[in-house]
Amino acid sequence: MYSLNSVVIAAMLFAVIVLAHEIGIRLGNFRLTQSDSDVKSQTSAIQGGVLGLLALILGFTFSMSIQRYDHRSGAEVNEANAIGTAELRTALLPAPYDAQAQAAIDEYIELRLRSSQVDLTHRDERRALNVATSALQQRIWDIGVAAADANPNPVKTGYFLQAVNELIDAYGSRLDALQRHVPPAIFYLLFVFFISTGALIGYSSGLGERRSRVPALVLTMLICLLVFIIIDLDRPRRGVIQVRQDSMEALR
């Protein structure tokens, strides 16, 4: 599902719900002569319960998407802070290790910014960037270790190594945040509820002598718009809503 465009998913869902609504109307028309006020009241009560349950699941899913978006935003800021701290602590290293560490961290910043622009569906490119990132982290760490070995008083270099360790941890946390999505099973459950609700609303409308399709279409459009927002929030590095890289850009 993550390989499909969010707009395509929302449009397909809209079409299926409208189709289910029309089928529901036809079924309601078929049952119209066999229905009385009690049947219509029961159908309306069930419809209200289903809509309430749908709103609960929809709100829960939206909350999950927002939490994951906030987590990714926080991870971006934390990584930028960790890199900035390591960059400042290069001044604690003796020459020539300070210049080597500064150059390596500058390269690391550019690599991380380049990684942040790659779609998660481009697996090969992401894998290559992750390998390059790990190799550069090791190079920065080796520079710190070499500086500690060459320095008779390694306290200052120890501060730098601590910052590098936090830099690596922040990278791991951000990588983990990118992999966390709303479980696909929840989306499938939502889609089943949406389609069933559309059919039920259509059936309830079909039981009436007069009906209007406009309210049902408006409700369907609002549902699909909310689904689009949820999916967009749940998909980092693609779509309309993305985590800004201001903190990382400021390190340049």
Which ranges hold each PLM region?
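Short extracytoplasmic/periplasmic juxtamembrane "stem" segments immediately C-terminal to an N-terminal membrane anchor
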Residues: 76-93, 244-252
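Alpha-helical transmembrane anchor segments
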Residues: 2-10, 14-33, 176-252
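Structured inter-helical modules in multipass membrane proteins
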Residues: 86-179
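Juxtamembrane/interfacial segments around transmembrane helices
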Residues: 63, 97-113, 237-249
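N-terminal low-complexity, intrinsically disordered segments
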Residues: 34-45
